[in-house]
Regions:
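Short glycine-rich phosphate-binding loop at a beta-alpha junction
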Residues: 13-23, 98-99, 151-152, 341-353
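Short beta-strands and strand-loop turn motifs
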Residues: 66-67, 117-120, 146
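Carbohydrate-associated surface elements
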Residues: 46
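Active-site core segments that coordinate phosphate-bearing ligands/cofactors
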Residues: 50, 57-70, 74-75, 80-113, ...
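Short beta-strand to alpha-helix junction loop
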Residues: 130-131, 155-159
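N-terminal glycine/serine-rich phosphate-binding loop of ATP-dependent small-molecule kinases
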Residues: 1-39, 67, 95, 167-177, ...
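A conserved helix-loop-beta module that forms one wall/lid of the active-site cleft
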Residues: 142-155, 386
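Short beta-strand-loop/turn "lid" adjacent to the catalytic site in phosphate-handling enzymes
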Residues: 7-43, 72-76, 107-128, 151-154
């Protein structure tokens, strides 16, 4: 598919100055010494990591671990995926020469260069948040093979040239393949239209997941941050995105898909105004395991409310209202924890990504947080990707100028 798109650009005679890839975090492929992929990558929602955090923390101290990598412990993290493979004596892990996160793998196919981009590596729970290099202590303690962890490349740099055969096949010639914020959240946060004096700059990257946090200069590696379940992820310009991963619009997406499958399809422009008028006194914990991947999301919500003495939603509008006000309540809880760890409380909240189009959720969030909400851009990830390519090419000076371009463009 990537080559098809590049061929289309070549056929139109377009001059391509750069190519860059960003994706979701934590997932990876393993390649052998000959560059062959050792089996298809496994989705982070796979059950193989079940119980792995408990296994890992029998061997390493969680507080000391957080003080090094500053990562929110989540069962889906690369650390636990790799440890599950080690426990299972995976032949793929034994034969692996390189670990490549999803965007690293695609970049490898385009360039032949096997390296690991900083922001995507920071989702693994295997990166030292201070040195921005691998957390060799944890890697060694768990007996993971050192040699699979490659050179870290920073966003805003060239990670390789388009392979000659692909350059000829697509008609594009020599093109730089650029390291951007390969973790889509990092690219999205780069495109937050904040001003230089807006510190700390607070954001919610709103999609399937909601990533709520601030951009800071140095990681926060305190016990308070660990207990509050915040993570230090890599950002553009060497900055840190200090955030919490929250189940976002996943619940809404599942509801809409379920209703469609049952012949009860709903349109957002119809159901959201109905939810605006609905009233229900129920707040559900959106991160609860009950809502991770149930057979029926609607039934999971109804059952949770019934078994926890909450008002049970009777209509689709009440279900949607319950979900959105619960999300806003979770945002408020996370922001309260965040403010306790910052030198001053946040003054406004930027909501970016597809979820920024949900005006009801934006309003509920503003009310719950008690601060103004600034919505957009919707395509923050794409904008951040492209403008970081411009940064690598010297067309943009720094992250502040990048954000000025965003402000002038929306």
């Amino acid at each position: 598919d990537m080559k098809t798109g590049l061929k289309m650009a070549g056929a139109k005679g377009l001059k391509v100055d750069g190519i860059a890839i960003d994706t979701w975090g934590v997932d990876f492929g393993l390649i052998d010494k000959d560059g062959n992929l050792l089996g298809n990558p496994v989705c982070y929602r796979d059950a193989r990591t079940k119980g792995m955090p408990e296994e890992v923390f029998k061997q390493i101290d969680p507080s000391a671990h957080y003080a090094i990598n500053g990562t929110q412990v989540m069962e889906i993290n690369t650390l636990f995926q790799l440890y599950s493979m080690k426990k299972a004596n995976s032949p793929q892990l034994e034969k692996a020469a390189h670990l490549l996160f999803t965007p690293d793998l695609f970049s490898y196919y385009l360039t032949g260069e096997a390296n690991n981009e900083y922001t995507i590596a920071s989702t693994s729970e295997l990166l030292n948040a201070t040195t921005k290099d691998w957390d060799w202590e944890t890697i060694d303690q768990l007996g993971l093979p050192r040699h699979i962890f490659g050179k870290i490349v920073m966003p805003g740099t060239v990670r390789g040239k388009l392979r000659r055969d692909i350059a000829e096949e697509t008609g594009l010639g020599e093109v730089d393949v650029i390291a951007v914020g390969s973790h889509d959240t990092a690219s999205a946060v780069a495109a937050v239209p904040a001003t230089e004096d807006e510190y700390p700059m607070a954001f919610i990257s709103s999609g399937t997941w909601s990533l709520l946090g601030v951009e800071i200069e140095k990681p926060i590696l305190t016990e308070e941050a660990r207990k509050a379940e915040f993570t230090n992820e890599g950002g553009i310009g060497g900055r840190i995105t200090f955030l919490q991963n929250i189940t976002g619009l996943w619940i809404m997406q599942r509801l809409m898909a379920e209703w469609k499958e049952n012949g009860e399809e709903q349109q957002f422009d119809i159901i959201l105004p109905q939810a605006e008028e609905a009233h229900i006194n129920a707040i559900i914990p959106v991160d609860d395991a009950a809502f991770q991947n149930p057979a029926s999301m609607q039934q999971a919500i109804i059952d949770y409310c019934a078994t926890h003495q909450l008002q049970v939603p009777q209509t689709k509008a009440e279900i949607v209202r319950c979900v959105l006000q619960s999300l806003a309540a979770k945002y408020a809880e996370a922001t309260a924890h965040l403010n306790e760890m910052l030198p001053q409380p946040i003054k406004c909240m930027h909501i970016i990504g597809g979820g920024s189009q949900n005006q009801l959720l934006n309003r509920l969030t503003s009310e719950a947080l008690g601060v103004p909400v600034i919505a957009g851009p919707i395509e923050a990830t794409g904008m951040g990707n492209i403008l970081t390519q411009a940064l690598a090419k010297g067309e943009i000076k720094d992250i502040d100028e990048l954000r000025a371009v965003v402000r002038q463009s929306i």
